[in-house]
A protein has these predicted regions:
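Short coil/turn connectors at secondary-structure junctions
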Residues: 18-21, 48-51, 82-85, 101, ...
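Short glycine/serine/threonine-rich phosphate/pyrophosphate-binding segments
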Residues: 31-38, 63, 126-129, 140
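Active-site histidine-anchored catalytic micro-motif
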Residues: 51-67
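Catalytic cores of enzyme domains
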Residues: 122-202
Length: 202
């Protein structure tokens, strides 16, 4: 009810139309109540007539294989039976653009083929780099949806440039892909869900 209330009380549903296939990201980090949050999001989207599905979005984690990444999200309870929609995985990527320095922007093929994307992730400070956007919905776009190839391109300049590259690639994805919403989760000091916020792609 909490998630549905946030979505229905805001202008976020204007872009969600019946029949739209919408990809929801699920990462490799253990997020409190992840499966429940995804289930409620799926339920709301289905009420709008959309056709949601979940994709593991975790760069090269899970051994950089679709099977390995599916196993990770299944361990977190994100299964078709629980969340109420297909849970699909691929490591194939599609080039959707380039940065001004000629570096390719890659995203997961399933996300690229969807009518819309919802980037869902926990927002927190990163342990290895600093930047305007650290761990959160923007890094999920760049590293998570980038799969192994996208993550490698972003990391190529080293950890010192990772903060700026996460931002650059994320804005490139926002420009070239239909990112409908971001769902940001903030946990308290006990790693319990404290705040959930929904943002438009803009």
């Amino acid at each position: 009810d909490y998630i549905a209330g946030m979505l229905s009380d805001a202008p976020h549903t204007r872009k969600i139309r019946p029949g739209m296939r919408i990809a929801i990201t699920a990462g490799s980090r253990g997020i409190d109540h992840l499966a429940v949050i995804i289930r409620e999001l799926v339920s709301f989207l289905k009420e709008q007539g959309a056709l949601p599905f979940v994709i593991p979005a975790m760069g090269s984690h899970g051994g950089a294989t679709a099977e390995g990444q599916l196993a990770i999200v299944h361990e977190y309870g994100v299964t078709e039976e629980f969340v109420g929609c297909p849970v699909l995985a691929t490591m194939e990527v599609v080039k959707i653009g380039e940065l001004d320095v000629g570096r390719p922007i890659f995203i997961n093929r399933l996300a690229a083929e969807a009518d819309g994307i919802i980037s869902l992730n926990r927002i927190k400070a990163h342990t290895a780099f600093r930047g305007s956007y650290e761990s959160g919905v923007m890094k999920m776009l760049t590293i998570g949806l980038g799969c192994q190839q996208g993550a490698e391109v972003c990391h190529r300049q080293g950890i010192l440039h990772l903060g700026e590259n996460v931002e650059k690639f994320a804005f490139g994805i926002l420009k070239n892909a239909n990112v409908l919403l971001g769902v940001g989760i903030i946990e308290n000091a006990y790693e319990q869900t404290a705040v959930i916020r929904v943002m438009t792609g803009e």
